[in-house]
Curated annotation (Swiss-Prot):
GO biological process: riboflavin biosynthetic process
Location of the active site: 126 (proton acceptor), 128 (nucleophile)
Family as reported in the entry's similarity comment: Belongs to the GTP cyclohydrolase II family.
Comment on bound cofactor: Binds 1 zinc ion per subunit.
Organism in which the protein naturally occurs: Helicobacter pylori (strain HPAG1)
The protein's required cofactors: Zn(2+)
Binding residue positions for Zn(2+): 55, 66, 68
Pathway it works in: Cofactor biosynthesis; riboflavin biosynthesis; 5-amino-6-(D-ribitylamino)uracil from GTP: step 1/4
Name of the protein described by the UniProt record: GTP cyclohydrolase-2
Entry GO MF terms: GTP binding; GTP cyclohydrolase II activity; zinc ion binding
Amino acid sequence: MKRLEVSNQAKLPTQFGEFCIQCFREKGSSGSKDHLVVFTPNFSQNPLVRLHSECLTGDALGSQKCDCGGALQMALERISKEGGLVIYLRQEGRGIGLFNKVNAYALQDKGYDTIQANEMIGFKDDERDYSIAGEILEYYRIKKMRLLTNNPKKIAALEKYAEVTRESLIVCANEHNQGYLEVKKLKMGHLL
């Protein structure tokens, strides 16, 4: 835990149920970044885990261009019933940040897919780093989990820290995100 500062725990009542929250401040050469863990008080030794990267447009604004907000809501609903945690990483736009994400959205409006748009503004298809999530899992002493994901990169990253069983999390396609979901499946290998 050399690069993490950990906050106190607090209660968080939500529309999905009662949770606790705890913040993890990641310290790095370019400053600090705060990540949030939302969890049920007494989760099992094989909890449901959702590793979720921040998506302001989907999570807070209800964007239909992606499946992020729906995936987060589905995860919170399941976790409130079955026990577990959401590790909410501050990695907006698959790690490119909000400013660059909006620029990528503008390119998508012109017909480019999500990967092409990222590459056109100088980024890889996915710039995220999940190692901080591994440190968070170690903090909670999680050695085995049921990971709510369709992303094989998340599975591979977390298998370094714990035994992972994948549970799918399918958000229905709509007219705005159908192409995005197809790109995630065909070009990024998502298990949709």
